[in-house]
């Protein structure tokens, strides 16, 4: 009785903490006044740093596929004279394609307002899609751990640990989806001045 009530409250508290963090991130995107360029730079830097740490870019095909999947469909091949062992050269190539895509969207969308609207939409979509999945995951986790009453572990501690791991994984996925939405989307402006976006 009392234990399971307390457990339910603890589970709810964990979800509330995550929800507040997500809403703070959404608010930052919605009400951010100083252009979104600084936010986009941060997201790109974090995503690319993580890729540099986790991926093996000493093989040209790995670098090519990474750029094609996450940064730009416009890449034909990795330049032959690129030194794949040189971190700076690899970074420069990735950033070159990333900013080329951002500039292409600016050209396509013409006005600053439309471009910012597209950027905001791209990033909010990444946050919202992943948060919906995370809520679903937390509910399943709650049921799974709640049904393990007989295990030796403290269910609340176990829930918090798994929920935290899930939250960290979600933050990484949000970053990745933001980058892909911003760079790989196809955008066009209708005659009425509306944006049509096809997200990857």
Residue locations for each model-derived region?
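Extended, charged helical/alpha-beta scaffold domains that provide interaction surfaces
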Residues: 1-200
């Amino acid at each position: 009785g009392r234990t399971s009530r307390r457990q339910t409250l603890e589970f709810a508290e964990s979800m509330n903490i995550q929800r507040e963090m997500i809403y703070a991130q959404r608010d930052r995107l919605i009400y951010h006044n100083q252009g979104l360029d600084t936010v986009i730079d941060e997201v790109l830097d974090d995503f690319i740093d993580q890729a540099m740490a986790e991926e093996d870019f000493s093989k040209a095909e790995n670098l090519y596929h990474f750029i094609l999947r996450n940064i730009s469909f416009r890449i034909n091949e990795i330049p032959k004279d690129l030194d794949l062992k040189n971190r700076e050269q690899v970074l420069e190539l990735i950033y070159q394609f990333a900013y080329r895509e951002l500039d292409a969207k600016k050209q396509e969308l013409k006005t600053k307002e439309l471009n910012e609207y597209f950027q905001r939409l791209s990033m909010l979509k990444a946050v919202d899609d992943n948060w919906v999945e995370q809520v679903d995951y937390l509910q399943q986790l709650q049921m799974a751990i709640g049904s393990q009453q007989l295990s030796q572990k403290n269910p609340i501690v176990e829930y918090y640990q798994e929920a935290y791991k899930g939250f960290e994984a979600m933050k990484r996925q949000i970053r990745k989806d933001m980058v892909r939405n911003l760079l790989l989307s196809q955008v066009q402006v209708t005659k009425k001045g509306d944006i049509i976006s096809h997200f990857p």
